[in-house]
Structures are given as structure tokens and as C-alpha cells.
From Swiss-Prot:
Protein name: Protein translocase subunit SecA
Catalytic reactions on record: ATP + H2O + cellular proteinSide 1 = ADP + phosphate + cellular proteinSide 2
Positions with a binding annotation for ATP: Q89, G107, E108, G109, K110, T111, D502
Taxonomic path: Bacteria, Pseudomonadati, Pseudomonadota, Alphaproteobacteria, Hyphomicrobiales
Organism: Brucella suis biovar 1 (strain 1330)
InterPro entries tied to this protein: Helicase_ATP-bd (IPR014001), Helicase_C-like (IPR001650), P-loop_NTPase (IPR027417), SEC_C_motif (IPR004027), SecA (IPR000185), SecA_CS (IPR020937), SecA_DEAD (IPR011115), SecA_motor_DEAD (IPR014018)
Keyword presence, Hydrolase: no
Single GO MF annotation: ATP binding
Length: 906
């Protein structure tokens, strides 16, 4: 039965189809200009950039220039890169220009498509950022596409790890800047820790195109970028806590894999209480007394480290370090650390060096970083499943771009086995059969551990020549993937999301040339060898096509349909044939966590024998339903986290804007006076409450506050004795005295130095208090969730208390700044330190440690008028001895050293 919605779509087409149809008409208009542009000389084509910029200066819009700018970029791509963007790429380019997300299948040319809107938007000169997932892709795309932009007179920069500030500033000043999401985010945070505008590297955030947009804006949305500084070393404590976990029995804790939580049961709590008491780390009577909050936090981290985090799946141990593995891509993330002590708990678990805990100095999530851009767009092979999230959080519409050629890949139904062992036996059989007929195979696994287990099985079965691609061998990644389309190739890979390199049937020409001809100079010999490699690849491609194209064999389903679709999408690029199939077992994580018990019982009733699979579209639908549930739950988590982060983000914006204003101010006299007056008002209202009787006034406290905060000694006791004096009069007199002292100081310092001092004190104080405030917000966030049990909305509680903390921070800022400015003085140059006398060479007795002193000491110190020659000293009168060295024999004649005799009394 066809639903009404389905029937309407058949008659009128979906909204996606209608939108594509409109854009296709515009693409045809651009194609109609192609002949005109083909007739232009290189110089005429290059002159178009200046022509477009002049039109923009006269008030024309980018939209009005789009057809000609796209036609220019297309023609330049043909001449410089030897590639012509298809009409579907023009459609994708328009989506990117119009703040959308272009979902484009793998191999359809996303990188080339992006050049069209990049060129158009770079004409404004405000900067365009092309964001990729790793340094390799950023550098590769900047080099390849940079030739096109340079031809058209635009500058291109690349931001990657290891650049200094000058190099970064130059790259951001370019018309087009390629870089990774991490580098861009960290540069923003670092800029907001600088003290002068000239030190900053980024320009205002104008336009960004995010490649693999789902990976960056969804998968990594929960991961904040944090710049931190080390705290004290507590490695002994982490190691102690870690010893408590391995002896625990299953009854001592509960693990919820769905929610990814681990907690102690009542029995377990009693056990760890006894262990803590024995170790002297339990305060009070119960583990849950307020004094033990930090200990409970560390215990929970240790339990999570042991029971929720698996080595070679969630992290690997390399060079005495814990390196996190991206759960979506299988990539290592060196330098990335879990916060709040979890990373240290993992280090203790694996017995590697425990790095000190860090204090957050600055942080931001990708969600809030990318929402700062005036214009944001993205491209990916898979985004439709997350269209709701892109719309709700980023205001981005997802448009599926049709393929240039029809997709010929066959997506087979999943094969489900009862046990993991049966599943792997079936996988090995299938790999052997496909390998023997020369079909290239890409095997997708969900973890390093599983990819290596499968590799070991293939070795035992005598299948040779396979490649393993996972986080351990990140460096060879691009080359391995580039050759995965060669006939008979078997490539085992952890999740392929965001890999960024196409698998071309027959092999990748560019990669082979780079690998095989790196030492062959330009010339006829090199050209001949390139022609030979081309012919070889063409031959290999024919063989791969004859064998059925690339076979994507997945060993497990991921929580996200999008990751599964990305893996499938590696096959069948640009109209090539191919096939994909998922092999599952009821013991797989997704099946086990989401109700495989019912399915297991049903399969047993059906009489499923060992090594027999069930294949049915119903299974696929059931799995898709489970995945949708997980995706919906993860979306809710991200949405909820964003609501909390938005509170911090609003405060972050206020602080960062204040810092920028401070950098630009040339005279801070009024700002500081305002802060000083507010401090005085707060001081007076605290000690002399409004309308309170004089007996209730705390005059002694007020005098102390004036001394500590304003560095003034004012006769407030005398003022208090005056008749009819009110709090306003106190305020006015204190303000007058403080303003006078500040004005005198400004007169002594001079305006330039005073402004510099004020700026330095305000910004340093602001940074220190902001860091403390971030810690307070983290603590508030960790406890506010429990308010839900008291029927109070945790988010509203967080908003209210975070605002109060912010107000307190600003009040503290005023006090700290004014207190320091009222005390600061210019210190004259310190006198040069006196030169030490040359050391005298003394003979030391090796057996007694005594030295030949007497006259040598005198010779050494004769410049000092406090030294009296030994012959002039009266043993009975210490006043005649002058200055005596501590190691000199005591002048009293005891035979002891001075330090052990009369010198002991000094």
C-alpha cells in the first residue's frame, strides 16, 4: 500500500528533487557560457578576477556574479588541472554558496566542486576557509587546487601543525586558507589569550566550507577544544586508586553499555571505603561525605577506565603514552587527552607515565566555533540521515546531489550468524572466493583489535598480500587506500569515515607516480614511464571491472547508519560496478546491546544450524530501527550539551569581546575610574547597609577594606562621629580620595605608561579569573544534573547559577584590578650586583675535610673592611674579631670551626 506522502512524492517529486531541478536550470545557464570562455586567452581569463572585484566594489552582489564566476573557475580548472566540473558539481557548488550542505557520493569530485564557491566568495577579499579533517588532506588540496587559484590571481595558504605565529598570520591573510578543524579552533583560542591585536593570527570569521562536515559538526560536536596548563603531580594517588579496581567482583559495580556509564553498587562502595580507610584517604565516616567528593570522582574515573574503555579500540599505548582513537574514523588523535582525570586513570591502568592533570585555560566546542562564521556550508558523502540536526543546530539545509553517472553498486542484504566465530569463518570463506577471482576487496572493521584479529585469521588460512589500515599505521594510509582497487587486493581497514582518498579501480596514477618516479627528473624519460604506468593502470582496471569491481565487506554494523553508508560508498564510484555486504553476529556490540536475545530465541526456533546464516530484508529493517534509536539518543545528548555550552559560550563571547575592546583602547582612565567607583560602592554598602542605624555600621571593617583594596589610610572613624553623615557621604569622600591618589599616580607615570600598566593588569587579572571561572562552571555542570531528582530543571538551575558565578567573577575582577593599580609603582633600575671575588685555591685535607685557611681567607676578603687580620683579634673579646667566615677556625682558640663554636650562636 502506498502512503499519501509517497504518492505525492511520485507525482510531484520530493523537495530535494524540486530544489535540484531549479539549480540544474542555473547550471545549464552556466554551461551555455562555456563556449565564450573557451575562446578567451589565458590573460583574458585571468583578468576576470579583477573585473569581478571591481563589480563588487561598485555594489554588485556575489549572487549576480555567480554564473560568470563559476564559468571562469570551470574554464580555469580545464586549463590548469585538466578537469572539467560536471553540471552536478555546479549544482553542488551553488548549494555551498547558498549556506547548504551538499551530499555528494564518494568519487564524484567534492574537492573540485568546492573550487567554484571558494573562488566566488574569495573575490570579496574577506577570507575563505576550507576545513578538512587532517593535515595531509589540507596540504594536498591546497597544493593541488592552489594551482587553479594562483592562475586566477588569488593567494592560497595552509594551516597545519608546527607553524609559528608569523607563518599562521600569513596563511590567514591569504584569500583562501586550507586547514584542519582542530588547528583553526586552537588558533582562535590562542588569539584570545594574546595581549595585543598585532600578535593575533586570525581575521574575522567570514566563510567556511567544511569537508566531511558530518564528521566535524556531528561526530566531534561533543568534544571541546581545550587549551590547558598542568596542575600538581598526583601520580601516586592515581596509582593507588587504580589498585582498588581489578580485585572487584561483578556484584561490586554496574555497567550500562547503552548509556556508557559505570557505577559502584552498595557492596562495591563498602569495599572501596575499607580500602581507602586502610590507605588513609577516607575523610569522615562515609565515602559520600562532602570532604570525599574528589576521591569519589577519581574512583569513578578508575572504574570507567577499566570497565568501559578497551585497549586497541578506544585507545592504544604508544611510546609510553595513551593515544585516543577516534571511534568514528579509527584514526589516532595524538595530543588529544580526556579531561577531568580520566586520561590519568587510563595511564594508571596501563602502567605508563602519568602526566599531571590540567587546568582549563580556554575552551570551545566545534558547534560554537563554526557558528561564529558569517556564512557556513559543508560537503560530505553522507549527511541525509542527520539532516534534522544540521537544520536545528546550524541552520543548514542538506541537499542530495545526483551522481553524474547512475550508481551500479549492488548492496546485498546482511548475513546474520549466531556467534562471532561463525561470522568470521564465513568472512574468511567469502574473502578467499572473491580474492581468487581477482576482485579487489575492502574489509571494514570497527576497531584496531578486530582488524588485527581478522588479519591473523587470513594469515592462518594462507591468504597473502593483504594490507591492514588502522590507527597504528596512519602514515602509510593514503598509499594503501590508493592501491586498494588493484585486482586481487585485500585491504582491511578500521572505519573509513573521513579518509579523504578515493579508491580507484586499477590503482591511483598520482600516487604511483609519486612513489615510483620520485627520483626520476622531468623530461622525456619520465614522460615515457608515466605513460607506461597509465597503460598498466588501464589494464588493471579492466581486470578489476571484469571481476565485479570493488567489493566492500563489512564485519559489523556501526551505531550510526551514516558510517555504514560511508563504507558502502567506497565502492561503485563514478558509475563503476561494485557490491557491498555486511556480516553480523548476535554477539556484535550493536546486536547485543539492542535486544538480540529475542532474535536469538527466534533463530533457534527456526532451527538455524551452525555456520548457517539468516538473510532477510526484515533483519536489515530491524537493525536500521536500532540504529535510528541510537542516532536519536545521540542527537538528544548533543542538543542537550549544546544548551549547556551555549550558556558558557555567551559568557565567553562577553569576555573575549572585552579583551578585544581593551586591546584597542588608547585611554582607560574612564574605564578604571568606573571600576574603582563600583568597588567603593560595594565596599560601603557591605559595611554601612542602607538605612541602617549607626550602631550597626562596621567602621573598623570599612577602614580595613579601604587599606587592603585601595591602599589608603582614611580617617573613617572621625567621619563616623559627624552628625547626620550618611552612606552616600562616605562613598563620595572615599571616591574623592581614591581618585586623587590615582590621578597623582597617573601624573607620575605619564599617560603612555599608565595606559600600558592598566591594560596589562586588567587583561592578566581577567585571564586568571576566567580560568578559575571555567573550573567553577565545570564543577557546577557535574553536580547540577542531580537537581532533577528534586523536581528542578537542571538546565535552568545551571543558567541561574552560572550567571551568579559570572557576576561574582566580574566583581572579583574589579577588586583585583583596583587593588593592584592602587599599589603599583614604577621601580627604578636595580643597581648592578657586586662582582664576587675570585675564589682562592685552598688545600683540603682528604681525611679530615679541614682546609689550610688563615692568611688565604684574609687574602680573599681583604677588600671587605669588616674583616680583621687574625693577628689583630683578641681571643677573649669577640668584638675585635670583625667578620669571621663560617669555615674559619674560631678566633677563641678552641680549635673548632667558627660555625661549630661561637658561630653557632649567630
Amino acid at each position: 500500500m502506498v502512503s499519501f506522502g509517497g504518492l505525492a512524492r511520485k507525482i510531484f517529486g520530493s523537495s530535494n528533487d524540486r530544489r535540484v531541478k531549479t539549480l540544474r536550470q542555473r547550471a545549464e545557464q552556466i554551461t551555455a557560457l562555456e563556449k565564450n570562455y573557451e575562446n578567451l586567452t589565458d590573460e583574458q581569463l585571468q583578468a576576470k578576477t579583477a573585473e569581478f572585484r571591481a563589480a563588487l566594489a561598485e555594489g554588485k552582489s556575489l549572487d549576480s556574479l555567480l554564473p560568470d564566476a563559476f564559468a571562469t573557475a570551470r574554464e580555469a580548472a580545464k586549463r590548469v588541472l585538466g578537469m572539467r566540473p560536471f553540471d552536478v558539481q555546479l549544482i553542488g557548488g551553488m548549494v555551498l554558496h547558498e549556506r547548504g550542505i551538499a551530499e555528494m557520493r564518494t568519487g564524484e569530485g567534492k574537492t573540485l566542486m568546492a573550487t567554484l564557491p571558494v573562488y566566488l566568495n574569495a573575490l570579496e577579499g574577506k577570507g575563505v576557509h576550507v576545513v578538512t579533517v587532517n593535515d595531509y588532506l589540507a596540504t594536498r588540496d591546497a597544493e593541488t587546487m592552489g594551482r587553479l587559484y594562483n592562475f586566477l590571481g588569488l593567494t592560497v595558504g595552509v594551516i597545519k601543525h608546527g607553524l609559528d605565529d608569523d607563518e599562521r598570520r600569513a596563511a590567514y591573510a591569504c584569500d583562501i586558507t586550507y586547514g584542519t578543524n582542530n588547528e583553526l579552533g586552537f588558533d582562535y583560542l590562542r588569539d584570545n589569550m594574546k595581549y595585543e591585536r598585532a600578535q593575533m593570527v586570525q581575521r574575522p570569521h567570514n566563510y567556511a566550507i567544511v569537508d566531511e562536515v558530518d564528521s566535524i559538526l556531528i561526530d566531534e560536536a561533543r568534544t571541546p577544544l581545550i587549551i590547558s596548563g598542568p596542575l600538581e603531580d598526583r601520580s601516586d594517588f592515581y596509582n593507588l586508586i587504580d589498585t582498588f579496581i581489578p580485585p572487584l567482583a561483578e556484584e561490586d559495580y554496574e555497567v550500562d553499555e547503552k548509556q556508557k556509564t559505570a557505577i559502584f553498587t552498595e557492596v562495591g562502595t563498602e569495599k572501596v571505603e575499607k580500602l581507602l580507610e586502610a590507605a588513609g584517604h577516607l575523610k569522615g565516616e562515609s565515602l559520600y561525605d562532602i570532604e570525599n567528593v574528589a576521591v569519589v570522582h577519581h574512583l569513578n574515573n578508575a572504574l570507567r577506565a577499566h570497565k568501559l574503555f578497551q585497549r586497541d579500540k578506544d585507545y592504544i599505548v604508544r611510546n609510553d603514552e595513551i593515544v585516543i582513537i577516534d571511534e568514528f574514523t579509527g584514526r589516532m588523535m595524538p595530543g588529544r587527552r580526556y579531561s577531568e582525570g580520566l586520561h590519568q586513570a587510563l595511564e594508571a591502568k596501563e602502567h605508563v607515565t602519568i602526566q599531571p592533570e590540567n587546568q582549563t585555560l580556554a575552551s570551545i566546542t566545534f558547534q560554537n566555533y563554526f557558528r561564529m562564521y558569517n556564512k557556513l556550508s559543508g560537503m560530505t558523502g553522507t549527511a541525509a540521515t542527520e539532516a534534522e540536526e544540521f537544520g536545528n543546530i546550524y541552520g543548514l539545509e542538506v541537499l542530495e546531489i545526483p551522481t553524474n553517472l547512475p550508481v551500479q553498486r549492488i548492496d546485498e542484504d546482511d548475513e546474520v550468524y549466531r556467534t562471532v566465530e561463525e561470522k568470521y569463518r564465513a568472512i574468511v570463506r567469502d574473502i578467499r572466493a572473491s580474492h581468487e577471482k581477482g576482485q579487489p576487496i575492502l574489509v571494514g572493521t570497527t576497531s584496531i583489535e578486530k582488524s588485527e584479529q581478522l588479519a591473523e585469521r587470513l594469515r592462518r588460512e594462507g591468504i597473502k598480500g593483504f594490507q591492514v589500515l588502522n590507527a597504528r599505521y596512519h602514515e602509510q594510509e593514503a598509499y594503501i587506500i590508493a592501491q586498494a582497487g588493484v585486482p586481487g587486493a585485500v585491504t582491511i581497514a578500521t572505519n573509513m569515515a573521513g579518509r579523504g582518498t578515493d579508491i580507484q579501480l586499477g590503482g591511483n596514477l598520482e600516487m604511483r607516480v609519486r612513489q615510483e618516479l620520485s627520483d626520476v627528473p622531468e623530461g622525456s624519460e619520465r614522460e615515457e614511464k608515466i605513460a607506461a604506468i597509465k597503460a598498466d593502470i588501464a589494464q588493471l582496471k579492466e581486470k578489476a571491472l571484469a571481476a565485479g569491481g570493488l567489493y566492500v565487506l563489512a564485519t559489523e554494523r556501526h551505531e550510526s547508519r551514516r558510517i555504514d553508508n560511508q563504507l558502502r560508498g567506497r565502492s561503485g564510484r563514478q558509475g563503476d560496478p561494485g557490491r557491498s555486504k555486511f556480516f553480523l553476529s548476535l554477539q556484535d556490540d550493536l546486536m547485543r546491546i539492542f535486544g538480540s536475545d529475542r532474535m536469538d530465541g527466534m533463530l533457534q526456533k527456526l532451527g538455524l544450524k551452525e555456520d548457517e546464516a539468516i538473510v532477510h530484508p526484515w533483519i536489515n529493517k530491524a537493525l536500521e530501527k536500532a540504529q535510528k534509536k541510537v542516532e536519536a539518543r545521540n542527537f538528544e545528548i548533543r542538543k542537550n550539551l549544546l544548551k549547556y555550552d551555549d550558556v558558557m559560550n555567551d559568557q565567553r563571547k562577553v569576555i573575549f569581546e572585552q579583551r578585544l575592546e581593551m586591546m584597542d583602547e588608547e585611554d582607560l582612565t574612564e574605564t578604571v575610574a568606573e571600576m574603582r567607583h563600583e568597588v567603593i560602592e560595594d565596599m560601603v554598602i557591605l559595611r554601612i547597609p542602607k538605612d541602617a542605624y549607626a550602631e550597626k555600621w562596621d567602621i573598623a571593617g570599612l577602614k580595613q577594606d579601604i587599606a587592603s583594596k585601595l591602599n589608603l589610610d582614611l580617617p573613617v572613624e572621625e567621619w563616623a562621629k559627624e552628625e547626620d553623615i550618611a552612606e552616600e557621604e562616605f562613598e563620595n569622600r572615599i571616591k574623592e580620595a581614591a581618585d586623587k591618589a590615582a590621578a597623582e599616580k597617573a601624573e607620575r607615570f605619564g599617560p603612555q605608561i599608565m595606559t600600558y600598566v592598566e591594560k596589562s593588569v586588567i587583561m592578566q587579572s581577567l585571564d586568571n579569573l576566567w580560568r578559575e571561572h571555567l573550573v567553577n562552571l565545570d564543577h557546577l555542570r557535574s553536580v547540577v544534573g542531580f537537581r532533577g531528582y528534586a523536581q528542578r530543571d537542571p538546565l535552568n538551575e545551571y543558567k541561574t547559577e552560572a550567571f551568579e558565578l559570572f557576576q561574582t567573577m566580574l566583581a572579583n575582577l574589579r577588586e583585583v584590578v583596583i587593588s593592584q593599580l592602587m599599589r603599583v609603582e614604577i621601580v627604578g633600575e636595580a643597581p648592578p650586583e657586586p662582582q664576587l671575588p675570585p675564589m682562592a685555591g685552598l688545600h683540603i685535607d682528604g681525611t679530615t675535610g679541614e682546609n689550610d685557611f688563615d692568611e688565604a681567607i684574609w687574602a680573599e676578603h681583604q677588600h671587605d673592611d669588616r674583616i680583621v687580620p687574625p693577628a689583630q683579634r683578641d681571643p677573649a673579646d669577640p668584638r675585635t674579631w670583625g667578620k669571621v667566615s663560617r669555615n674559619e677556625p674560631c678566633p677563641c682558640g678552641s680549635g673548632k670551626k667558627y660555625k661549630h663554636c661561637h658561630g653557632a650562636f649567630e
